[in-house]
Amino acid sequence: MIIRSPEPEVKIVVDRDPVKTSFEEWARPGHFSRTLAKGPDTTTWIWNLHADAHDFDSHTGDLEEISRKVFSAHFGQLSIIFLWLSGMYFHGARFSNYEAWLSDPTHIGPSAQVVWPIVGQEILNGDVGGGFRGIQITSGFFQLWRASGITSELQLYCTAIGALIFAALMLFAGWFHYHKAAPKLAWFQDVESMLNHHLAGLLGLGSLSWAGHQIHVSLPINQFLDAGVDPKEIPLPHEFILNRDLLAQLYPSFAEGATPFFTLNWSKYAEFLTFRGGLDPVTGGLWLTDIAHHHLAIAILFLIAGHMYRTNWGIGHGLKDILEAHKGPFTGQGHKGLYEILTTSWHAQLSLNLAMLGSTTIVVAHHMYSMPPYPYLATDYGTQLSLFTHHMWIGGFLIVGAAAHAAIFMVRDYDPTTRYNDLLDRVLRHRDAIISHLNWVCIFLGFHSFGLYIHNDTMSALGRPQDMFSDTAIQLQPIFAQWVQNIHATAPGVTAPGATTSTSLTWGGGELVAVGGKVALLPIPLGTADFLVHHIHAFTIHVTVLILLKGVLFARSSRLIPDKANLGFRFPCDGPGRGGTCQVSAWDHVFLGLFWMYNAISVVIFHFSWKMQSDVWGTISDQGVVTHITGGNFAQSSITINGWLRDFLWAQASQVIQSYGSSLSAYGLFFLGAHFVWAFSLMFLFSGRGYWQELIESIVWAHNKLKVAPATQPRALSIIQGRAVGVTHYLLGGIATTWAFFLARIIAVG
């Protein structure tokens, strides 16, 4: 038996009025830093102001104060999110054709933006069907609103106003919990209470209330909509909630109320809590009854999880105990000390959260098309492409952010004197083996994946198709992926006897779901072309990981610069007189990692866009013949680099290049402008600081000559500022170019 000292009671403690509210203070730029508050001597001041405004570590070393600032900033972030949501719902209420779309989602496109004719730009208002002219949107909000049971623009107005009220509340909370009642450090470090509340409250009750909404409001309203009832005739949401008989007409077991629940006769609820799998043939989305069932199940799991951790009652898990018990025969001290790291370094905590959230976001991207959750989402190809691309980019950025904050943790918060032989220490001690092996893997993947393409290009150029790697010559079939597909396709009735359909049509099985003559989803065949591009994915991901991981593992020291920790997170070089030590800071690794993240995500979204247009998306005739958008050309065209350039980039860019004079012309302008932003970045990435300083001195001389010299001395951007401006424009330009290219193409042909 383990004898424990009695747990200290958790007391909720706050400091009253710790920081006075002062508008004069806030109005003084740089008030958070003694140096910056003095005002500008040189133009570097404005850059430092932006760099340090949110770097709370640089304002104070007091962990409690830092925690309060972060906590308060989170409320500000939530306020912005509510404001943005309110704007989306307001546009749906004020400027959209939502009610028309609801009545005929297969023939009318979603639009929630009408351009005002100020300088003749009303050409952008294209005909989206049903006599409505506006910009076609691809955010998926209409499909989400339908799934929620929203049937009128008035309901959207009310929701928009509600979100505004919440935005104001969040702003108030951010002020209140910093200036009026600020929590003490112990409150931020009480992880068991935090886990219980977040798991049971946010995730558990959140999922439960959503399940309740779906059962009582969404399901009945969608039943009526699917049956073709005019949205204006459908009872209002509160009528379903207050009047059980209304629901009982649609789902007879509702008449029995909660009796089946308490008598454990749960199968009575199988009418509206189903386990069907597959897609609803009417809407092309997952069965809403499956989704309600899922949220109910998730709610139960999280409500249980939210009661697992030990607080005032002396029962349950203690996180510290779990972590310290977590060691194997080969892992030394295991996770000992991790509890202290994660409760005193918010960078370490944030790093883990970003890595997990980034990975989850990428998983979401892949599920949005393979298991489309909302009605009429699968046949809205523009929205499908946008949702995939959006979630892939966001996931990529979050994962790079994870590496950034892991490196900041290593530099600012890691204390090597107290860490010995735990897992982190062991990883750091054999970092050379890790990085050199990873480097070897990158070289192998790079040469072999690219080599397969170069082989194909060469054979194609020499007119020897029989010697190419392709489905019709030398086959390189992705046998493991096909095996995984097959397992899932055959699971219903075999390994998953209760399921009627496999989790996704993409696995195989031959069935196809089409809505209004358009393909929603069908089994996705994988072949040699996918095998080739998959290895490019493996290559780009491994290089990104190599750069980011090297930055983290060598953030404090390296053979080249043993005292790197003293130089901080970002520094240009190890001082004058030590050549060859530039661009080694942890910040520089994040900078380089961003470019490879961009490479990796670009290949993924290009692969997705072409594969779906070639093998999935298209129309179906009355005889059941499917005609794909690009006629299945992916398998034969994408096996050469030339094919990617000719049949994907060039062929599909025709819509954006020829968009002038049409409602898609804004995409043509964006395509051009974003290319320009991208090219502008190269000016910052390819030229050095001295070049600009020389030029500036010359310009300052001219100003002095004319007696118009400014009081603030102009300075060239520092090396790091220049690289930051460069990578920002590189990514912004690249992403906006891709966005214009994708949307002009898919709106024109989809």
UniProtKB/Swiss-Prot annotation:
InterPro entries referenced in this protein's UniProt entry, alphabetically: PSI_PsaA, PSI_PsaA/B, PSI_PsaA/B_CS, PSI_PsaA/B_sf
UniProt keyword terms in alphabetical order: 4Fe-4S, Chlorophyll, Chloroplast, Chromophore, Electron transport, Iron, Iron-sulfur, Magnesium, Membrane, Metal-binding, Oxidoreductase, Photosynthesis, Photosystem I, Plastid, Thylakoid, Transmembrane, Transmembrane helix, Transport
Binding residues annotated for chlorophyll a', in chain numbering: H675
Catalysed reactions, as listed in the record: reduced [plastocyanin] + hnu + oxidized [2Fe-2S]-[ferredoxin] = oxidized [plastocyanin] + reduced [2Fe-2S]-[ferredoxin]
HAMAP family xrefs: PSI_PsaA (MF_00458)
Stored PANTHER family: OUTER MEMBRANE PROTEIN, OMPA-RELATED, PHOTOSYSTEM I P700 CHLOROPHYLL A APOPROTEIN A1-RELATED
Protein name as annotated: Photosystem I P700 chlorophyll a apoprotein A1
Record organism: Triticum aestivum (Wheat)
Gene: psaA
